[in-house]
From Swiss-Prot:
It comes from Escherichia coli (strain K12). The azo reduction activity is inhibited by dicoumarol. Pfam families: Flavodoxin_2. Changing residue 60 to A: 27-fold increase in the Vmax value for p-methyl red reduction. This is FMN-dependent NADH:quinone oxidoreductase. The gene is azoR. GO terms for cellular component: cytosol.
Length: 201
């Protein structure tokens, strides 16, 4: 039995293409892998606090006493990291906002990236500590950006996930959604076909 963690990060709730596709992924995965456990975390419905000068102090080893706000941030960081490490497959629904990931997803990463916990520095450079996972990124875009200089989502996510130890990453693209109903329908159809292929593999 595998454990699957789905991270939603769109501010558009049910209108979101990436949310709809991640819901489709869950439906297909449950159909093919009925014994697996699936956890869904909606980072827009339940937002992660923005990392600031106070909160960053909670995530660095120190003997200094923590403020109540820092204690809450550290407890949440511990919870998010434990959840991430406990799952085998990580599904990230990542819409493109202004060429990159959403603030909601970035806030999550800022609390998950902790030296000595999810990565460490060695003589040979940084080493990721979240290993043995597979990641599937479902990314939706209004325009066409794949393989071009305006796609900052793909390289950023590949780099971040690899940095913490997740190197088996597959991407599902839904592009051209803002180009009209016909293009949006094709984007959804192509993305669902890609999801079907991943789920059945």
């Amino acid at each position: 039995m595998s454990k699957v963690l789905v991270l939603k990060s769109s501010i558009l709730a049910g209108y979101s293409q990436s949310n709809q596709l991640s819901d489709y992924f869950v439906e297909q995965w449950r159909e093919k892998h009925s014994a697996d456990e699936i956890t869904v975390r909606d980072l827009a419905a339940n937002p992660i606090p923005v990392l600031d000068g106070e909160l960053v102090g909670a995530l660095r080893p120190s003997d200094a006493p923590l403020t109540p706000r820092q204690q809450e941030a550290l407890a949440l960081s511990d919870e998010l990291i434990a959840e991430l490490k406990a799952h085998d497959v990580i599904v990230i629904a990542a819409p493109m906002y202004n060429f990159n990931i959403s603030t909601q997803l970035k806030n999550y990463f800022d609390l998950v990236a902790r030296a000595g916990v999810t990565f460490r520095y060695t003589e040979n450079g940084p080493e990721g500590l979240v290993t043995g996972k597979k990641a599937i990124v479902i990314t939706s875009r209004g325009g066409i950006h794949k393989d071009g200089p305006t796609d900052l989502v793909t390289p950023y996510l590949s780099t971040f996930l690899g940095f913490i130890g997740i190197t088996d990453v597959k991407f599902v693209f839904a592009e051209g959604i803002a180009y009209g109903p016909e293009m949006a329908a094709k984007a959804q159809s192509d993305a669902k076909a890609a999801i079907d292929s991943i789920v059945s593999a």
